[in-house]
């Protein structure tokens, strides 16, 4: 099990980024959540199989076509025991 926090910077709000992350996390079988931050970034928590978590982080690095990702800062964190994945 791997658990990470990802902070995504760039043009990532108002472009469907969170919903695209939710779909990709579901496809990968990753648990956690994603939300907008007041400073314009998006924060996500991913928990699950290490390869699946890496896939979710990789998706954030590219994002949907409507987004322009400038950077993704990833930090290893303690698991929250999330069940499923949701947009906050």
Q: For the regions a protein language model found, what residue spans apply to each?
A:
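Intrinsically disordered, low-complexity, mixed-charge
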Residues: 1-88
